[in-house]
Amino acid sequence: MNKPICSTGLRWLWLVVVVLILDLGSKQLVLQHFHLYESVPLIPYFNLTYAQNFGAAFSFLAEKDGWQRWFFAFIAVAISVVLMVMMYRASAKKKLSNIAYALIIGGALGNLFDRLVHGFVIDFIDFYVGDWHFPTFNIADMAICIGAGLVIIDSFLSPDEKTIKVG
């Protein structure tokens, strides 16, 4: 059964491209203008700091022997494929879920690119209060988190299609 792409959630894949351009472009600027661990204050509580993340979120598993690079690459590909299938099966009118999936895919692919090309993910956004610093992150991480939040919001707003209607 072939459906026109514009009638499916895949219509929102343009957002994946936007996330990739913003993410990879910002990381390239960091690579060109920063040394590792160099930090530039922008405003109070916010620095740009070049860091290399060999693990996942919050450097989870970063201290392992290198197998995590391929593990997280596999996870990114698997999640991207599953979400694209879900988008294909969904109507283009399900904007919130399709936007959420596109943000997650864009973020996953942005970090996947880093893992495959550099062997690590380039992080540079550094929020802090006093001496406490939130783990450094990047635009791909933001897209994934925003997408995950939208999935949660959508689960509360969208009626459950499996619910049996009484009456």
UniProtKB/Swiss-Prot annotation:
Spans traversing the lipid bilayer: 5-25, 42-62, 70-90, 102-122, 137-157
Location in the cell: Cell inner membrane
Pfam families, per the entry: Peptidase_A8 (PF01252)
InterPro entries for this protein: Peptidase_A8 (IPR001872)
Enzyme class, spelled out: hydrolase
Function of the protein: This protein specifically catalyzes the removal of signal peptides from prolipoproteins.
Membership in a protein family: Belongs to the peptidase A8 family.
Protein's name in the database: Lipoprotein signal peptidase
